[in-house]
Design a protein with these regions (language model features):
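Short glycine/serine/threonine-biased micro-segments
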Residues: 11, 74, 102
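N-terminal export signals
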Residues: 3-27
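Extended active-site neighborhood of metal-dependent phosphoesterases/phosphodiesterases
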Residues: 83-150
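Helix N-cap and loop-to-helix transition residues
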Residues: 2-3, 112
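Short, glycine/serine-rich, charged loops/turns that create anion-binding
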Residues: 11, 46, 79, 106-107, ...
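Secondary-structure boundary motif
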Residues: 12, 66, 94-97
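A short hydrophobic/aromatic micro-motif that marks alpha-helical segments and, especially, helix-coil
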Residues: 17-18, 59, 92
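N-terminal active-site segment of His-dependent metallophosphoesterases
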Residues: 22-87
Length: 150
């Protein structure tokens, strides 16, 4: 990149950052936000690969309930959409509060995205939600590059 172009882009980036509370601002509205929220994250449980996945998920749910987190999120590589995994999914459902799913790169090893959405009860591969004055955005980063296209 040429020096002049770099300096121009740097200046534009700095100008964008100085515009407060506009569409370009990504800070939460702290006047609406609760003082503190807590949530539990679990990732790479790999039900279909790890023999102790049920036990590990049970411990996660127990700890989330014990710590009284506001909600839980599983960050992908959870379980395939197969009848044998209904018991595992039922463990997840024992958490009494809000819970969210995110597709992982291995979740579609045996199933389509559509099958995973149906099995987990996800609204879409990407979605957003508000909690405690904060806005959370879940994105789908799982796109395969095949035949020169995504």
């Amino acid at each position: 990149m040429k020096r002049r172009k770099f300096i121009n882009q740097l200046g534009l980036g700095a100008a964008v950052l100085t515009v407060p509370n506009t569409v370009l601002s990504f800070t939460p509205s702290f006047s609406k936000a609760n003082k503190e929220i807590t949530f539990g994250l679990v990732a790479d449980v790999h039900k279909d690969l790890m023999p102790d996945a049920n036990g590990r998920l049970e411990v996660f749910i127990e700890q989330a309930q014990k710590r009284k987190v506001d909600f839980i999120i599983q960050m992908g590589d959870f379980c395939f959409a197969e009848i044998k995994n209904k018991e595992f999914l039922n463990i997840w459902e024992t958490y009494k509060g809000p819970k969210y799913h995110i597709l992982g790169n291995h979740d579609m090893d045996k199933n389509t995205k559509s099958e995973m959405l149906d099995f987990w009860g996800m609204p879409k591969t990407y979605y957003s939600y508000d909690f405690g004055g904060y806005h959370f955005i879940v994105l789908d980063a799982n796109f395969l590059y095949q035949d020169n296209k995504f």
